[in-house]
Amino acid sequence: QPLPDQKERKKEFNTEIDIQALLKQLNDLTGMQSVKTEINNMINLLKICKIRQENGLQTPPVTNHMVFLGNPGTGKTTVARILAKIYHGLGVLSKGHLVEVDRSGLVAGYMGQTSEKVTEVIEKAKGGILFIDEAYALANGQQGDFGQEAIDILNKAMEDNRDDLIVIAAGYHDEMQDFLDANPGLRSRFNRTIEFPNYDAAELLEIMTNRAKSLDYTLTDDAVQYVQDTFTRILACPPENFGNARSVRNYLDRVIHNQANRLITENNFKEEDLTKLTLADVQSETLE
């Protein structure tokens, strides 16, 4: 029995996927209110399209490829991973997995290898989302570079596999314009752009305290105040390599190491001290 043509795949709600739980997971993420609104709107459209289809009505064509614009550590990959599962639950994708690549995962150094590499990645991503981080790097190569070849193959694959593949191209705002201009068809393929704002000081603090809590740690009041003041100061003039939530997670990891060293050195601690991150712990580290 031959497999049905991909475009004939019947798209039905996957009742085993708890879409409401996934939406809660999305909406519980710190900050990014505009992102959540945009994605909830997209999902509402897909739900209605599905119901119209079930009632024998015409459904408007929906292109699901997207561009995510924003700095590192603003939640782009996290949102893409949740989105893949939601789209699987809605029947838009047959598997709902996420394949994450950057330029090195698509571009090879010799003639003919790039085509093989891109095709292999596309095959692996079918049924899910292909997330291309720093996609603009594909368009930034020198003459004779194979980045353009990767873009051209990708452009065709997005159209050929649009029934069961979503491509999300992610990166900084300005550089991504070069990527979208690298092939005449790209802008029409990526007809939805979502901007991920940087976190403010209160949101970074929430990310840190939530992560600490998930690891059975709490920050003392003076540690919380110190961290909030530090975030406020850093954001007033952020260093070039500041990674938003990524920097906060790395900072917390180092603070936890400080606490371990402090407790072992003091050698006189109670069980409750194992969960406390103090002012001394957070002051010993710089946020990078």
Predicted regions and their residues:
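Conserved C-terminal "switch" segment of AAA+ ATPases
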Residues: 90-95, 175-181, 187-188, 196-241, ...
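Conserved catalytic/switch belt of AAA+ P-loop NTPases
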Residues: 136-168, 174, 181-185
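Flexible beta-alpha connector loops of hexameric P-loop NTPases
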Residues: 103-114, 137-148, 193-195
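Short glycine-rich substrate-engagement loop in P-loop NTPases that contacts/grips substrate
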Residues: 96-125
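C-terminal helical "lid" subdomain and adjoining coupling/linker elements of P-loop NTPases
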Residues: 11, 18, 28, 219, ...
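Pre-Walker A (pre-P-loop) alpha-helix and adjacent loop at the N terminus of AAA/AAA+ ATPase modules
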Residues: 21-64
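Walker A/P-loop
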Residues: 58-96, 123, 190
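N-terminal accessory segments that target, anchor, or regulate ATP-driven/P-loop NTPase machines
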Residues: 1-14, 62, 162, 166, ...
